[in-house]
A protein has these predicted regions:
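Phosphate/dinucleotide-binding and metal-coordinating scaffold of catalytic cores
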Residues: 1-189
Protein backbone atom coordinates (compact mmCIF):
# COMPACT_ATOMS: atom_id res chain seq x y z
CA UNK A 1 0.00 0.00 0.00
CA UNK A 2 2.80 2.41 0.86
CA UNK A 3 4.58 1.77 -2.45
CA UNK A 4 1.37 2.51 -4.38
CA UNK A 5 0.84 5.68 -2.39
CA UNK A 6 4.40 6.82 -3.05
CA UNK A 7 4.03 6.21 -6.80
CA UNK A 8 0.77 8.16 -6.78
CA UNK A 9 2.70 11.07 -5.24
CA UNK A 10 5.41 10.77 -7.92
CA UNK A 11 8.03 9.22 -5.62
CA UNK A 12 10.08 6.14 -6.38
CA UNK A 13 9.62 3.67 -3.47
CA UNK A 14 13.01 2.07 -4.21
CA UNK A 15 14.79 5.36 -3.48
CA UNK A 16 13.42 5.73 0.05
CA UNK A 17 15.70 4.90 2.94
CA UNK A 18 14.57 3.05 6.05
CA UNK A 19 14.50 6.41 7.87
CA UNK A 20 12.27 7.88 5.14
CA UNK A 21 9.83 5.00 5.60
CA UNK A 22 9.84 5.40 9.39
CA UNK A 23 9.11 9.12 8.97
CA UNK A 24 6.07 8.16 6.91
CA UNK A 25 4.90 5.80 9.68
CA UNK A 26 5.33 8.74 12.08
CA UNK A 27 2.93 8.43 14.99
CA UNK A 28 0.34 6.35 13.12
CA UNK A 29 1.92 2.95 13.71
CA UNK A 30 0.89 0.29 16.17
CA UNK A 31 2.55 0.13 19.57
CA UNK A 32 4.53 2.70 21.50
CA UNK A 33 7.20 3.62 18.96
CA UNK A 34 6.79 6.85 17.03
CA UNK A 35 9.12 8.44 14.51
CA UNK A 36 10.04 12.11 14.07
CA UNK A 37 10.11 14.12 11.96
CA UNK A 38 6.86 12.82 10.56
CA UNK A 39 6.08 12.94 6.83
CA UNK A 40 2.40 12.85 5.88
CA UNK A 41 0.77 12.43 2.48
CA UNK A 42 -2.90 12.86 3.29
CA UNK A 43 -5.25 15.20 5.06
CA UNK A 44 -7.52 14.24 7.94
CA UNK A 45 -10.98 13.10 6.87
CA UNK A 46 -13.63 12.30 9.46
CA UNK A 47 -16.12 10.89 6.95
CA UNK A 48 -15.60 7.15 7.49
CA UNK A 49 -18.03 5.06 5.42
CA UNK A 50 -17.00 1.51 6.35
CA UNK A 51 -18.71 -0.11 3.35
CA UNK A 52 -16.89 2.27 0.97
CA UNK A 53 -13.54 1.65 2.68
CA UNK A 54 -14.11 -2.13 2.53
CA UNK A 55 -14.89 -1.84 -1.19
CA UNK A 56 -11.73 0.21 -1.79
CA UNK A 57 -9.67 -2.37 0.15
CA UNK A 58 -11.02 -5.11 -2.11
CA UNK A 59 -10.02 -3.08 -5.18
CA UNK A 60 -6.49 -2.74 -3.86
CA UNK A 61 -6.31 -6.44 -2.98
CA UNK A 62 -7.25 -7.15 -6.60
CA UNK A 63 -4.48 -4.70 -7.71
CA UNK A 64 -6.99 -2.23 -9.07
CA UNK A 65 -6.73 1.55 -8.79
CA UNK A 66 -8.43 3.16 -5.79
CA UNK A 67 -9.14 6.87 -5.51
CA UNK A 68 -9.16 6.46 -1.70
CA UNK A 69 -5.51 5.39 -1.44
CA UNK A 70 -4.52 8.38 0.74
CA UNK A 71 -7.39 7.76 3.15
CA UNK A 72 -6.80 4.01 3.37
CA UNK A 73 -3.12 4.53 4.08
CA UNK A 74 -3.81 7.20 6.70
CA UNK A 75 -6.37 4.98 8.44
CA UNK A 76 -4.17 1.92 8.72
CA UNK A 77 -1.75 1.46 5.88
CA UNK A 78 1.20 0.97 8.21
CA UNK A 79 -0.37 -1.67 10.41
CA UNK A 80 0.37 -4.75 8.30
CA UNK A 81 -1.25 -8.08 9.07
CA UNK A 82 -3.21 -10.63 7.11
CA UNK A 83 -6.35 -8.55 6.64
CA UNK A 84 -7.02 -4.97 5.60
CA UNK A 85 -7.95 -2.77 8.53
CA UNK A 86 -8.36 0.80 9.62
CA UNK A 87 -7.50 2.47 12.90
CA UNK A 88 -10.06 5.14 13.68
CA UNK A 89 -11.66 7.08 16.51
CA UNK A 90 -15.39 6.68 17.10
CA UNK A 91 -17.06 8.58 19.96
CA UNK A 92 -13.63 9.42 21.42
CA UNK A 93 -12.62 5.74 21.50
CA UNK A 94 -9.79 4.28 19.41
CA UNK A 95 -10.81 1.21 17.38
CA UNK A 96 -9.25 -1.20 14.89
CA UNK A 97 -11.87 -2.24 12.32
CA UNK A 98 -11.06 -5.18 10.06
CA UNK A 99 -12.32 -5.91 6.56
CA UNK A 100 -12.39 -9.21 4.70
CA UNK A 101 -9.42 -10.35 2.63
CA UNK A 102 -9.70 -12.18 -0.69
CA UNK A 103 -9.63 -15.59 1.01
CA UNK A 104 -12.37 -14.79 3.55
CA UNK A 105 -16.07 -15.35 3.35
CA UNK A 106 -18.21 -12.23 3.14
CA UNK A 107 -19.29 -12.54 6.79
CA UNK A 108 -15.83 -12.96 8.29
CA UNK A 109 -16.43 -9.94 10.54
CA UNK A 110 -19.49 -11.51 12.18
CA UNK A 111 -17.64 -14.79 12.67
CA UNK A 112 -14.65 -13.07 14.29
CA UNK A 113 -17.01 -11.09 16.53
CA UNK A 114 -18.79 -14.30 17.58
CA UNK A 115 -15.42 -15.88 18.42
CA UNK A 116 -14.48 -12.85 20.52
CA UNK A 117 -17.75 -13.20 22.48
CA UNK A 118 -17.03 -16.90 22.97
CA UNK A 119 -13.50 -16.14 24.21
CA UNK A 120 -14.87 -13.63 26.71
CA UNK A 121 -17.44 -16.18 27.98
CA UNK A 122 -14.55 -18.63 28.48
CA UNK A 123 -12.83 -16.13 30.76
CA UNK A 124 -10.24 -14.83 28.30
CA UNK A 125 -9.43 -11.18 28.97
CA UNK A 126 -9.34 -9.11 25.82
CA UNK A 127 -10.15 -5.63 24.57
CA UNK A 128 -13.77 -4.70 23.99
CA UNK A 129 -15.12 -5.85 20.63
CA UNK A 130 -18.02 -4.68 18.53
CA UNK A 131 -19.71 -5.61 15.26
CA UNK A 132 -19.91 -2.40 13.24
CA UNK A 133 -22.98 -2.23 10.97
CA UNK A 134 -22.85 -2.67 7.21
CA UNK A 135 -25.32 -2.58 4.36
CA UNK A 136 -23.39 -5.20 2.34
CA UNK A 137 -22.50 -7.86 4.93
CA UNK A 138 -23.37 -8.86 8.49
CA UNK A 139 -20.91 -6.31 9.85
CA UNK A 140 -17.25 -5.44 10.34
CA UNK A 141 -15.30 -6.74 13.33
CA UNK A 142 -13.92 -4.01 15.55
CA UNK A 143 -11.70 -4.22 18.60
CA UNK A 144 -10.69 -1.35 20.87
CA UNK A 145 -7.05 -0.59 20.31
CA UNK A 146 -5.02 -2.81 22.59
CA UNK A 147 -1.89 -0.75 22.02
CA UNK A 148 -3.41 2.23 23.85
CA UNK A 149 -4.35 2.68 27.50
CA UNK A 150 -6.53 5.62 28.50
CA UNK A 151 -6.89 7.01 31.99
CA UNK A 152 -7.53 10.41 33.56
CA UNK A 153 -4.04 11.61 32.59
CA UNK A 154 -4.61 10.83 28.90
CA UNK A 155 -3.83 8.08 26.45
CA UNK A 156 -0.57 6.16 26.66
CA UNK A 157 0.92 4.01 23.92
CA UNK A 158 1.81 0.40 24.78
CA UNK A 159 4.78 -1.50 23.35
CA UNK A 160 3.70 -4.53 21.37
CA UNK A 161 5.16 -7.01 18.92
CA UNK A 162 3.65 -9.93 17.06
CA UNK A 163 5.18 -13.39 17.28
CA UNK A 164 5.68 -13.34 13.50
CA UNK A 165 7.63 -10.08 13.69
CA UNK A 166 9.68 -11.21 16.67
CA UNK A 167 10.64 -14.47 14.95
CA UNK A 168 10.97 -12.80 11.51
CA UNK A 169 8.35 -15.11 9.97
CA UNK A 170 6.04 -14.58 7.04
CA UNK A 171 2.56 -14.42 8.59
CA UNK A 172 1.09 -15.69 5.32
CA UNK A 173 2.95 -19.00 5.66
CA UNK A 174 1.74 -21.18 8.55
CA UNK A 175 4.83 -22.03 10.58
CA UNK A 176 3.90 -21.73 14.27
CA UNK A 177 2.02 -24.01 16.60
CA UNK A 178 0.91 -23.46 20.20
CA UNK A 179 3.95 -25.33 21.55
CA UNK A 180 6.30 -22.83 19.88
CA UNK A 181 4.17 -19.88 21.01
CA UNK A 182 4.22 -21.11 24.62
CA UNK A 183 8.02 -21.57 24.49
CA UNK A 184 8.37 -18.06 23.07
CA UNK A 185 6.14 -16.66 25.82
CA UNK A 186 8.24 -18.38 28.48
CA UNK A 187 11.46 -17.00 27.01
CA UNK A 188 10.30 -13.37 26.84
CA UNK A 189 8.40 -13.17 30.13
Amino acid sequence: LLNRLLREHKQDPDKLTVLDRLAIVGKSGMGALTYYPEQSFSEENDNTDLDELAFQCQKILHTEYSDKLDELYRLGGTSGGARPKIMTTINDEDWIIKFSANVDGENEGKMEYDYSCCARKCGITMSETKLFPSEVCEGYFGIKRFDRISDISGTKRVHMLTAAALLELDFEQPSLDYHILMKLTKIIT
